[in-house]
């Protein structure tokens, strides 16, 4: 039975047979720059859209905290604390401590953006109550992805200092693969939470004008792109570190 090293060498030889080292290098650089640009664009877009609709008041005139309280009460969830965090767009649902964290702008704000963000985080709380499988998978992998994030942050420095480049690349590939899978699992979790938020707001009568639905939809749709960008970026980094192991520059990594 062939070893992993032999399998990797075989894969490298097959890639080298069809792709030149220069092409591999150019592709890896293009991939790196492209995914980085996508990440920047997604971050810029969600901030720009949020800034716009945070100035549009909702027709119901309720703060994000009040909207969240109404949604949780309707869902029969009474064991979650709604807390304020002094961090822009630091909103999240903490399933471990049963806390729904809203930034000050969304906790106190009465904008359509605040209403949408609060409802989205409530969507995660509803997922938790219903034992939504992808949320459970993400919760189970949090510690593992934490180690992977530490690896991708410090291993490049360690590898270049010790000149153990090939082992560094192999470990980085595994780390980015873990991060990529985590971000892949995150996609259905976030998309489902947004879908629940839009539906619940409509069912509860929070949309009292077309501007209400527009603001919520635009903010949540823009946020969705950040999760897509995170997945594509992780995939890009995985390929970026994997290509030197398979490509023509292989002897420099031995």
Residue positions per predicted region:
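Alpha-helical transmembrane segments
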Residues: 172-183
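Short, strongly hydrophobic alpha-helical membrane anchors
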Residues: 1-26, 249-254
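Membrane-interfacial loop-to-transmembrane-helix junctions in polytopic alpha-helical membrane proteins
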Residues: 20-23, 27, 134-141, 161-171, ...
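Hydrophobic packing and interface segments
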Residues: 25-31, 159, 170, 235, ...
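Core hydrophobic alpha-helical membrane-spanning segments
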Residues: 30-34, 154, 158, 181, ...
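Hydrophobic alpha-helical transmembrane segments of small proteolipidic membrane proteins, enriched
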Residues: 17, 21-49, 165-166, 171-173
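Post-HExxH zinc-binding segment in Zn-dependent metallohydrolases
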Residues: 142-165, 170, 200
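Polar-ligand-bearing catalytic/cofactor-coordination segments
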Residues: 43-148, 181-254
């Amino acid at each position: 039975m062939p070893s992993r090293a032999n399998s990797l060498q075989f894969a490298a030889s097959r890639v080298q047979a069809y792709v030149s080292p220069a092409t591999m290098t150019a592709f890896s650089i293009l991939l790196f720059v492209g995914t980085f640009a996508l990440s920047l664009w997604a971050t810029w877009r969600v901030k720009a859209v949020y800034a716009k609709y945070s100035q549009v008041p909702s027709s119901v005139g309720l703060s994000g905290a009040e909207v969240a309280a109404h949604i949780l009460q309707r869902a029969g969830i009474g064991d979650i604390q709604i807390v304020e965090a002094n961090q822009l767009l630091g909103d999240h649902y903490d399933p471990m401590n049963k806390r729904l964290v809203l930034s000050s702008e969304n906790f106190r704000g009465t904008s359509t953006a605040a209403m949408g963000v609060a409802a989205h985080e409530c969507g995660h709380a509803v997922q938790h109550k219903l034992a939504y499988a992808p949320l459970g998978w993400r919760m189970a992998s949090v510690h593992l992805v934490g180690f992977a994030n530490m690896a991708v942050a410090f291993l490049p420095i360690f590898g270049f200092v010790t000149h153990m480049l090939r082992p560094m690349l192999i470990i980085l590939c595994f780390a980015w693969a873990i991060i990529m899978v985590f971000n892949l699992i995150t996609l259905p979790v976030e998309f489902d939470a947004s879908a629940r938020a839009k539906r619940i707001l409509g069912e509860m009568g929070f949309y009292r004008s077309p501007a209400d639905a527009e603001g919520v939809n635009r903010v949540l749709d823009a946020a969705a792109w950040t999760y897509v960008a995170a997945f594509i970026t992780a995939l890009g980094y995985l390929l970026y570190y994997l290509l030197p192991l398979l490509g023509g520059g292989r002897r420099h990594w031995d």
